């Protein structure tokens, strides 16, 4: 019984370590590869990133204030392939999609509203499933 408990604790500690390591690597990836895409836009204070695998989808709701110029950046590790993303209003209507493969969009809204950023990682037929960081950054300027 003690041996089982010991292995369970060791297993849980290993999971916690690997989760913290993945988060740390994702932060470093974001700082190195994604932050420069904001250029002269001021980054908001939120860090939004996740480790995803082929076939995954994610969604993030964010408030956009009227009259402010924004840059939305979705930056992903190349191992994930051509990650798609789009902006949607509260009724689910598409406002913009990166059909051209762009990693960012610049926009300004007349009225304050909540928008959803939806991301989808393409499926892969590879025998080995790779995971990679996907970061969403929001910058603004007046």
Predicted features, each with a name:
Residues 1-5:
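N-terminal secretory signal peptides that target proteins for export/translocation
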Residues 7-18:
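Sec-dependent N-terminal signal peptides
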Residues 18-20, 28, 127:
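Processing junctions and N-termini across compartments
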Residues 22-41:
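Predominantly extracellular/luminal regions of secreted and cell-surface proteins
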Residues 24-25, 50-129, 140-142:
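Acidic, Ser/Thr/Pro-rich low-complexity intrinsically disordered segments
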Residues 43-44, 54:
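A short, polar/charged loop/turn motif at coil->beta-strand junctions and beta-hairpin connectors
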Residues 132-137:
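Eukaryotic complex-assembly/interaction regions
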């Amino acid at each position: 019984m003690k041996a089982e408990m010991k292995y369970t604790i060791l297993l849980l500690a290993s999971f916690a370590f690997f989760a913290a390591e993945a988060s740390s690597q994702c932060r470093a990836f974001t700082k190195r590869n994604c932050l420069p895409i904001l250029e002269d836009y001021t980054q908001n204070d939120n860090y939004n990133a996740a480790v995803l695998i082929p076939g995954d989808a994610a969604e993030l709701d964010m408030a956009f204030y009227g009259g402010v110029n924004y840059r939305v950046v979705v930056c992903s590790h190349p191992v994930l392939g051509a990650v798609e993303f789009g902006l949607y209003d509260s009724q689910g209507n598409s406002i913009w999609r990166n059909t051209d493969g762009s990693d960012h969009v610049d926009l300004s809204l007349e009225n304050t509203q909540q928008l959803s950023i939806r991301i989808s990682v393409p499926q892969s037929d590879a025998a080995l499933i790779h995971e990679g960081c996907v970061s969403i950054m929001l910058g603004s300027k007046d």
